[in-house]
């Protein structure tokens, strides 16, 4: 098994497809933006899952975390959709997706089924699945449940579940925020403006606020109530007894300034993989690594996918 551990900007030099010009400027030669489509899939329990789709080619599914929405991928999508079919979900409870009541409706098997419903709605048998934060937890679990439907797996920030318990044990104070989210009524402390406080992009911030106003704060907290381990207990929905090896190429990207999920959680990730495994640790990036280091993250993802795309 090939094991590649990359630090800082070591992947920045990976070649991307060059834009050929014949005298005109790069801006003139640039392709027009690919149109975005608002679409819906119906999950196994009847919940409607909204997603934004664009492009054609191998399917890439993007899954956001908390607090976020499908717009999280606004910088990545145009880097991919000239050669890939890119779909970005609003996970259940968020923005334009269904918002069922009750903790049980946010258990991991239902979140995994939502992703499967989107892939099915696209008429595909396989996809690359990419997730950040809760989206990464969903992506790991999608791999465990549907390895045969994966082309590749891309994870931002969240350790493999086998290592997650170790991180909780070694740095319990870093998960205090999650314990607070699990408390009854915690959603009453949330506002759309507060949830969007981390967003630095002036153009995107109003879009985040509007998306959060359309979302269910109770649903956001139910992700933690249904799936995050309580107290000092080991992970439950995140931790099946025996993890299957990740039998597809795996890319893991982590911002080393992340204070909720520490970089040490990714140690030994390669032991959980049966195919080539690439880890990119970015010293300057925080938890929202796809925003903090967008150029490096997006360029890496494109180059990594291109290198693993079957020859025509």
Each language-model region and where it sits:
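Short acidic-hydrophobic surface loop/beta-edge motif
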Residues: 39-44
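Flexible "cap/lid" subdomain of the alpha/beta-hydrolase fold that forms the substrate-access gate
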Residues: 32-36, 47-49, 59, 87, ...
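Catalytic histidine-centered segment of alpha/beta-hydrolase-like enzymes
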Residues: 285-294, 298
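Bacterial Sec signal peptide processing site at the extreme N-terminus
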Residues: 20-31
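C-terminal motif of bacterial Sec signal peptides marking the signal peptidase cleavage site
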Residues: 16-18
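Bacterial N-terminal signal peptides that target proteins for export
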Residues: 1-6
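Conserved HGGG/HGGXW glycine-rich cap/lid loop of the alpha/beta-hydrolase fold
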Residues: 47, 52-96
């Amino acid at each position: 098994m090939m094991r590649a551990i990359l630090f800082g900007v070591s992947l920045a030099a990976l070649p991307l497809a060059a834009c050929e010009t014949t005298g005109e400027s790069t801006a003139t030669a640039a392709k027009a933006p690919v149109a975005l489509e608002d679409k819906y899939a119906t999950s196994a329990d009847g919940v409607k899952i909204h997603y934004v789709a664009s492009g054609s080619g191998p399917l890439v599914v993007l899954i956001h975390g908390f607090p976020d929405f499908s717009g999280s991928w606004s910088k990545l999508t145009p880097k991919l959709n000239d050669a890939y079919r890119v779909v970005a979900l609003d996970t259940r409870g968020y923005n334009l997706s269904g918002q069922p009541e009750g903790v049980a409706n946010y258990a991991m098997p239902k979140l995994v089924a939502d992703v499967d419903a989107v892939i099915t709605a696209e008429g595909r048998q396989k996809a690359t699945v990419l997730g950040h934060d809760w989206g990464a937890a969903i992506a790991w679990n999608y791999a465990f449940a549907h390895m045969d439907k994966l082309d590749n797996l891309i994870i931002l920030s969240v350790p493999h579940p086998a290592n997650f318990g170790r991180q909780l044990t070694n740095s319990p104070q870093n998960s205090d925020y999650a314990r607070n989210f699990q408390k009854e009524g915690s959603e009453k402390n949330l506002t759309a403006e507060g949830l969007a406080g981390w967003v630095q992009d002036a153009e995107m911030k109003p879009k985040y606020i509007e998306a959060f106003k359309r979302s269910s704060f109770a649903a956001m907290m139910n992700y933690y109530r249904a799936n995050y381990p309580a107290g000092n207990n080991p992970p439950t929905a995140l931790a099946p007894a025996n993890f299957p090896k990740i039998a597809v190429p795996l890319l893991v990207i982590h911002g080393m300034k992340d204070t909720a999920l520490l970089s040490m959680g990714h140690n030994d990730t390669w032991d959980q993989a049966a195919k080539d495994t690439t880890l990119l640790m970015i010293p300057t990036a925080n938890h929202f690594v796809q925003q903090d280091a967008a150029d490096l993250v997006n360029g890496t993802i494109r180059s990594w996918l291109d290198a693993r795309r079957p020859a025509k």
